[in-house]
Amino acid sequence: MKKIVLFLAMASLFSCKQSEEKMISTKETSSENEKIAKELFVHFNKHDWQKMANLYTENPEFKEPTSGMKPQLKSRAQIVKEYREMQSMFPDVQNSVVAVYPSGKNKVIVEFVSKGTNPDKTKFELPICTIFTIENGKITKDFSYFDNSQN
């Protein structure tokens, strides 16, 4: 009987230690993923599209209202091209991060406001929420949600 109690105590202690290690590992990963998401916005606001694109895997998956929320794979070259085109339309575009919410092991949700000047010289402010999936230090998915019907 003593052996069984001792075994159960050891098993319980071992499983608690594993859970604690897993929690620490998840927190470290979450913190690193938050840094990557925040770094993306630094490069965005500097209009350094190549550095921004380098935060993604070779062919990450994107979803956004402008594509009808249909998943699309894009190369880094496509990302750079699309953001350069956007910059030519909105040369002063900037994103202001409102909040960053880590979610689980590999997701980071970023709430932000995109601001700039339309080609007709009117100002716009567009609230956006993006869910980033980050694996092995690179963004694999970028799902953005916004309503630009008022802009």
Could you say what each language-model-derived stretch is?
Residues S88-M89, G116-E125:
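Short, cysteine-centered beta-strand-loop-beta hairpins and adjacent loop/turn segments enriched
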